[in-house]
């Protein structure tokens, strides 16, 4: 029917995997989301009036070129497996834009200016955990819990408790994106022209529909 169709909801199998089992065959059961690669590059080009002004526009925020994001769940956790083209750069203390996952939930209430409720990995700790923070409309963040993480070369795995995101075994639908080294995460345009964002710009992927 070209006018409309009945909504199709998908079946998501419960799969449990250790956060450090980045090469487990269980990841073959995940939902896989693919990003464009090769566009995460330094920029140094003449401005539109450059022939007259000699002004160059430069950007060197390119760092981790995100390739794929795989997502699974069980009754207690969401699991993310993120791959990059080259080995992921090491986290540096205080870097709030290192390999972030931004999440929007169905009934999450107020969001930040980009429409997300949660940000993961704005802080990374030496005990193998990272922050899960609630986003506020004024651009502030408040810690609500922690996720587990494991990094091996170009693979980053994240294990997030559903209850930290106010989700459950029966309610796990999310919209999400992964981004790295965004120059101004309060400005949606920065998700187009700095660092890397998967998917690009203001777009999100959906899991659990």
Segments predicted by a language model, with ranges:
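Ser/Thr/Pro-rich, low-complexity mucin-like regions
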Residues: 151-196
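Catalytic domains of carbohydrate-active enzymes that cleave complex glycans
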Residues: 1-16
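Short, low-complexity, Pro/Ser/Thr/Gly-rich segments in the mature regions of secreted, periplasmic
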Residues: 201-208
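Internal alpha/beta core interface subdomains
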Residues: 14-19, 29, 207
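Short beta-strand and strand-turn-strand segments in soluble, beta-rich domains
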Residues: 62, 134-144
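Beta-strand-rich interaction surfaces with strong enrichment in secreted/lumenal proteins
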Residues: 67-71, 144-149
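Surface-exposed coil/turn segments at beta-strand junctions on protein surfaces, enriched
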Residues: 73-75, 94, 149-153, 167
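Surface-exposed, glycine/proline- and aromatic-rich loop segments on solvent-exposed faces
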Residues: 20-129, 178-191
């Amino acid at each position: 029917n070209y006018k409309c169709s009945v909504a199709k909801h998908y079946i998501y199998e419960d799969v449990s995997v250790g956060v450090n089992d980045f090469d487990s065959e269980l990841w073959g059961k995940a939902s896989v989301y693919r990003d464009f690669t090769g566009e995460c590059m330094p920029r140094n080009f003449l401005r539109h009036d450059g022939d007259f002004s000699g002004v160059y526009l430069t950007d060197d925020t390119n760092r981790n070129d995100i390739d794929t994001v795989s997502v699974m769940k069980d009754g207690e956790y969401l699991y993310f497996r993120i791959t990059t083209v080259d080995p992921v750069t090491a986290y540096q203390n205080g870097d709030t834009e290192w390999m972030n996952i931004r999440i929007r939930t169905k009934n999450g209430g107020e969001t930040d200016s980009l429409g997300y409720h949660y940000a993961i990995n704005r802080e990374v700790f030496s005990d193998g955990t990272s922050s899960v923070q609630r986003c506020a409309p004024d651009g502030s963040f408040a810690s609500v819990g922690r996720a587990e993480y494991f990094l091996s070369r170009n693979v980053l795995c994240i294990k997030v408790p559903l209850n930290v995101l106010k989700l459950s075994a029966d309610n796990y639908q999310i919209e999400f994106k992964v981004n790295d080294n965004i120059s101004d995460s309060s400005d949606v345009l920065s998700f187009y022209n700095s660092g890397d964002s998967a998917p690009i710009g203001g777009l999100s992927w959906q899991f659990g529909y």
